[in-house]
């Protein structure tokens, strides 16, 4: 591009018709000219179109039943949690489309407030995966933060604003898009108050963090350091409004079930105890009857609980669910390993009793679905080491003995190819 300097006023912008003297700059192309004012206008139009495309359109927003159906393809079990999340997410993005306000039947403006989500349940039962799958479906920025790394401002550790930086980074620094994203804060039970009564000494990683999270959970204009770390007065900040950011806060809350049973009167020991099998106890939704006062007794402050009105709970996965997780979802572990072996030209087969044995091992270890991959790696490591160096293996079969007794998987050799017969008449 050539830039036109001083000269006559015969040169005009090909778009608005203004002469060179009427504008600050006129830039020339092959037979055309464009002025600085038209360039600014083009930039504004492009920015508006990009902002519109990054928003979740209401007519495209899936209904709660569709959200739940999508989750079914990836997450096994946890039906109650799926329903709760589907409704909460649908209402949240419907509220964003309404611009935080809606009109009732009398034509009065009604302000629609945000409903963040609290997820309760044991480790390895799908809390994080549910949130990740939701974000994938809605095509919105998603960030995971660990509450245990957070401390109150002014102390060693991460500020709560660093959570927002992760979301901005997930949106490729598009702040407008980040403002409609989802933040998942894990291990929130670890920032519970150390005692039920407020302490005289400062609890910088417990109650202090809860206090620091209040504003961003509710919705505020936050100043985020672009490089992370601590704030200092001489640096520039990224401004982000958290009013439309959906927060999903989760934790295992070990010990909360005892607080609930003490309140409801369900005795676990003694002559009046309910007699239940171990399987029933393991798959019971311990948190179905949770009330705000139980969470306060556990160590969450009332203001923090008040900003998490939607409560979803997940249960321990039983053997049947773990077997389904191994083989049924779209990206099931068995399908992943079959694909890995296919890349080496080898078939991989798991017998049904092998899948059940892997599920039993995960239950014994108490790691839930998260432990399935570790068990699969242990079982398949010897053959995954040998097979790339061999060309005589057709199929690998994993049985229950492979899992339980540390026996090598059965290797089925490739049939030798017969040499082609030559025609004697040739």
Swiss-Prot record:
InterPro entries: AAA+_ATPase, ATP-dep_Clp_protease_ClpX, ATPase_AAA_core, Clp_ATPase_C, Clp_protease_ATP-bd_su_ClpX, ClpX_bact, P-loop_NTPase, Znf_CppX_C4. Pfam families: AAA_2 (PF07724), ClpB_D2-small (PF10431), zf-C4_ClpX (PF06689). SUPFAM superfamilies: Glucocorticoid receptor-like (DNA-binding domain), P-loop containing nucleoside triphosphate hydrolases. It comes from the Bacteria. Keywords: ATP-binding, Chaperone, Metal-binding, Nucleotide-binding, Zinc. GO terms for molecular function: ATP binding; ATP hydrolysis activity; ATP-dependent protein folding chaperone; protein dimerization activity; unfolded protein binding; zinc ion binding. Zn(2+) binds at residues 13, 16, 35, 38. Gene3D superfamilies: 1.10.8.60, ClpX chaperone, C4-type zinc finger domain, P-loop containing nucleotide triphosphate hydrolases. Residues 1-54 form the ClpX-type ZB domain. The keyword Flavoprotein does not apply. PANTHER family: ATP-DEPENDENT CLP PROTEASE ATP-BINDING SUBUNIT CLPX-LIKE, MITOCHONDRIAL, ATP-DEPENDENT CLP PROTEASE ATP-BINDING SUBUNIT CLPX-LIKE, MITOCHONDRIAL-RELATED. Belongs to the ClpX chaperone family. ATP-dependent specificity component of the Clp protease. It directs the protease to specific substrates. Can perform chaperone functions in the absence of ClpP. This is ATP-dependent Clp protease ATP-binding subunit ClpX. It comes from Nocardia farcinica (strain IFM 10152).
């Amino acid at each position: 591009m050539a830039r036109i300097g001083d000269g006559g006023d015969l040169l005009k912008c090909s778009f608005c018709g203004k002469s060179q003297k009427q504008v600050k700059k006129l830039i020339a192309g092959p037979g055309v000219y464009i002025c600085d004012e038209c360039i600014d206008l083009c930039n504004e139009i492009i920015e508006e179109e990009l902002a519109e495309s990054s928003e979740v359109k209401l007519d495209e927003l899936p209904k709660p039943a569709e959200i739940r159906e999508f989750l079914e393809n990836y997450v096994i079990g946890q039906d109650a949690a799926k329903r709760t999340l589907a409704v909460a997410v649908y209402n949240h993005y419907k509220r964003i489309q309404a611009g935080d306000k809606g009109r009732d039947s009398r034509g009065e403006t009604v302000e629609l407030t945000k409903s963040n989500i609290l997820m309760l349940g044991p480790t390895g039962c799908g809390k994080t995966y549910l949130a990740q799958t939701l974000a994938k479906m809605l095509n919105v920025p998603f960030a995971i933060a660990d509450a245990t790394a957070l401390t109150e401002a002014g102390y060693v550790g991460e500020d709560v604003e660093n959570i927002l930086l992760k979301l901005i980074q997930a949106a490729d620094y598009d702040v407008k898009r980040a403002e409609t994203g989802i933040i998942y804060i894990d291990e929130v039970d670890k920032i519970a108050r150390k005692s039920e009564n407020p302490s005289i000494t400062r609890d910088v990683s417990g109650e202090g963090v809860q206090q620091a999270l209040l504003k961003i959970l509710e919705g505020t204009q936050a100043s985020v350091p672009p490089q992370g770390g601590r704030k200092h007065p001489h640096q520039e900040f990224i401004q982000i409004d958290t009013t439309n950011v959906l927060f999903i806060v989760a934790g295992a809350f070990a010990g909360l079930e005892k607080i609930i049973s003490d309140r409801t009167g369900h005795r676990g020991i003694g002559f009046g105890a309910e007699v239940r099998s171990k399987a029933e106890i393991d798959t019971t939704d311990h948190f179905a009857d949770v009330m705000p006062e139980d969470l306060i007794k556990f160590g969450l402050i009332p203001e923090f609980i008040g900003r998490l009105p939607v409560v979803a709970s997940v249960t321990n996965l039983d053997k049947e669910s773990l077997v389904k997780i191994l083989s049924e979802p779209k990206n099931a572990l068995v399908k992943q390993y079959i694909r890995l072996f296919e890349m080496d030209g080898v078939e991989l087969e798991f017998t049904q009793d092998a899948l059940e044995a892997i599920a039993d091992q995960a239950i014994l270890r108490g790691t839930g679905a998260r432990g399935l991959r570790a068990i699969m790696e242990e079982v398949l490591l010897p053959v995954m080491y040998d097979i790339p160096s061999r060309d005589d293996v057709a199929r690998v079969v994993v049985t229950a003995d492979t899992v339980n007794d540390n026996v090598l998987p059965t290797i089925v050799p490739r049939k030798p190819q017969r040499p082609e017969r030559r025609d004697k008449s040739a």
